[in-house]
Amino acid sequence: MTTTVGIAVKDGVVLATDKRVTAGYYIAHKRGEKIWKIDDHVAATMSGGVADLQSVLSFLTLRAHEYKIEYKRPIPISALVNYMSLILFYSRPYIYIVHSIIGGVDEEEGAVLYMVDWLGTVTKEKYIATGSGSPYAKGALEVGYREDMTLEDAVDLAIKAVKAAIRNDPGSGEGIDVVVITRKEGFKRVFTTQQKLVLPSL
């Protein structure tokens, strides 16, 4: 259970997540990092089984580095997404419990955002939310998204979307992480906050 959000605009991609890590309704960790840097130009959010995600995203990171060494340029994001889809599809009947947003900026497509589910299904999106808090986050995205959004507007909207999920979903909480990926600066963490526990007066 979690909330992850992705928004693609002209100048780059924004990825945002909450920080609560759960096992069912047990809160296992309060400072989880759910945005995985694959390479300087691309990253993925983590929703689902942590061990499965770490395994699959490690493969993607290795493939991205191999591609850069072999071809002397960053891997196209569509190729990376197709590689992940093949891993998930051909792992059947064993299923990796993963649901990931992959976003970044490349020479082929500019700022681009994909969603990949545990069966290997791939969809290209302008904005998307995954995880148990996604109905609340998606509502905020539907209301706030505009085609002409600036990167700063997209960061603000991503934060609002994750906050909406945290307010309503017991599987999301503890704080927010936001990453921006642009052509000029690449992968950059731009916002993080940790919720403080406030005890009632006794």
Curated annotation (Swiss-Prot):
State the organism named in the record. Pyrobaculum aerophilum (strain ATCC 51768 / DSM 7523 / JCM 9630 / CIP 104966 / NBRC 100827 / IM2)
Report the enzyme's class at the first EC level. hydrolase
Summarize the protein's role.
Component of the proteasome core, a large protease complex with broad specificity involved in protein degradation.
Q: Return the Gene3D superfamilies for the record.
A: Glutamine Phosphoribosylpyrophosphate, subunit 1, domain 1
According to UniProt, the reaction catalysed is: Cleavage of peptide bonds with very broad specificity
Q: How does it assemble?
A: The 20S proteasome core is composed of 14 alpha and 14 beta subunits that assemble into four stacked heptameric rings, resulting in a barrel-shaped structure. The two inner rings, each composed of seven catalytic beta subunits, are sandwiched by two outer rings, each composed of seven alpha subunits. The catalytic chamber with the active sites is on the inside of the barrel. Has a gated structure, the ends of the cylinder being occluded by the N-termini of the alpha-subunits. Is capped at one or both ends by the proteasome regulatory ATPase, PAN.
Q: Where in the cell is it found?
A: Cytoplasm
Q: Name one GO molecular function term.
A: endopeptidase activity
Annotated protein name in UniProt: Proteasome subunit beta 1
This protein's UniProt keywords: Autocatalytic cleavage, Cytoplasm, Hydrolase, Protease, Proteasome, Threonine protease, Zymogen
Query: Which superkingdom is the protein from?
Result: Archaea
Q: What is the lineage of its organism?
A: Archaea, Thermoproteota, Thermoprotei, Thermoproteales, Thermoproteaceae
Q: Which InterPro entries match?
A: Ntn_hydrolases_N (IPR029055), Pept_T1A_Psome_bsu_arc (IPR019983), Pept_T1A_subB (IPR000243), Proteasome_bsu_CS (IPR016050), Proteasome_sua/b (IPR001353), Proteasome_suB-type (IPR023333)
